[in-house]
Curated annotation (Swiss-Prot):
MF (Gene Ontology): ribosomal large subunit binding
Main subcellular location of this protein, as a coarse class: cytoplasm
BP GO annotations: cytoplasmic translational termination
Taxon lineage: Bacteria, Pseudomonadati, Pseudomonadota, Betaproteobacteria, Burkholderiales
Role according to the record: Responsible for the release of ribosomes from messenger RNA at the termination of protein biosynthesis. May increase the efficiency of translation by recycling ribosomes from one round of translation to another.
Designated name of the protein: Ribosome-recycling factor
Listed InterPro entries: Ribosome_recyc_fac (IPR002661), Ribosome_recyc_fac_dom (IPR023584), RRF_sf (IPR036191)
Source organism per UniProt: Polaromonas naphthalenivorans (strain CJ2)
Cellular localization per UniProt: Cytoplasm
Gene: frr
Length: 186
């Protein structure tokens, strides 16, 4: 494996770590409604568990309410039960063919708790990115040891790897800050 391939692979894996972190952040509830919040909720559909988005239209009614419109009339009760049974703390209300999911107001204590969770998730993402940096640097050192690259190439590569590591960590920090502001906004 060449230095270029090592750097490309490290960059791709760091990007995947960042995307995974972003996906994990969407699962954390803020005071505002977000249709992505229901992505983790699965409902029984003819014997198999599928995400709600595959059996209904999920949209925002307003800043604090999600609407769920089942495509089949018989699915309403199952969707409502799946949302209620999820660990999201939501209480859906059925209005004919439409299910309204209001976002309950969060207490100050709950907001602080969620902020800690966001920071912990951010720290996990940073650790994953730093581990990828270490693996990439180890790969470059192995090439130098095997006389497939010079020490100058090693130094330059490590500087480049550090630069994109810093960039990804800064992106994680921005996402953490943004999510904390969303959570703390009343």
């Amino acid at each position: 494996m060449s230095i270029v391939e090592i750097k490309q692979q490290a960059t791709q894996k760091m990007q995947q770590s960042l995307e995974s972190f972003q996906h994990n952040l969407t699962k954390i509830r803020t005071g505002r409604a977000n249709p992505g919040l229901l992505d983790t909720v699965h409902v029984d559909y003819y014997g198999s568990m599928v995400p709600i988005s595959q059996v209904a239209n999920v949209a925002l009614l307003d800043a604090r309410t999600i609407s769920v419109s089942p495509w089949e009339k018989g699915m309403g009760a199952k969707i409502e039960k799946a949302i209620r049974d999820s660990d999201l703390g939501l209480n859906p209300a059925s209005q004919g063919d439409l299910i309204r999911v209001p976002m309950p107001a969060m207490t100050e204590e709950r907001r602080k708790e969620l902020t800690k969770v966001v920071r912990a998730e951010g720290e996990h993402a940073k650790v994953a990115i730093r581990n990828l940096r270490r693996d990439a640097n180890d790969g470059v050192k192995k090439l130098v040891k095997d006389k497939l690259a010079s020490e100058d190439d090693e130094r330059r590569s490590q500087e480049e790897i550090q630069k994109f590591t810093d960039r990804f960590i800064a992106d994680v920090d921005k996402l953490v800050t943004g999510k904390e502001q969303d959570i703390m906004a009343v």
